[in-house]
Amino acid sequence: DPEERPDELGDLDNQLADQHICNFSVFQSLLDHWALGQLFPIVPIHRLNEEPTLETTLVDITCDSDGKVSKFIDLSDTRDTLRLHEVTNSPYYLGIFLTGAYQDIMGDLHNLFGRVNEVHVFLDEDDERGYYIEETLPGNTVAEVLAMTQYFPNNLAQKMKSQIDQAIKADRLRPQEGMRLLADYERGLKEQTYLSFKTTNGK
């Protein structure tokens, strides 16, 4: 019973709360939560027929100790944990609402993650679904973010190729391995800054 615990154990539930690592940056997408303590509605947007059983907090992928969400909206007050489902091997989706474009503008390039994927959805009573998607905007790629900090992808790829060529000539790397390494490097520059996960069909 929490009421019978000694004072030093009063915060035990929060200290033992699980953590969900989320594929976003608090400083990019929820800057006002970190800076001002503003609270945003956060809820799962799938598995709605399952009861959530884990008391959790959210942490982002920035490796920054402040990149976390540990205060949430409750029915009549606030709470220090959010009840979520246990994570399986499948992606788990949360919705963070009422953020608006202001958060992204303020976040700018914090932690060099850049813009997230964006979808413009409009309500439409004439559409059978009740809404329509006007457009989708992809988030920044690694190459785009690096270019904003004066590290240009073409120069980086040339320097990588030069190092690979030297390693091949010195017999430290096989030519086939070197070409594969260079292809992986150039492909990585074209990918988005946030983690990407292949679906079950490999796409």
State what each model feature region is.
Residues D1-K203:
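Charged (often Lys/Glu-rich) extended helix/loop segments that serve as interaction or gating elements
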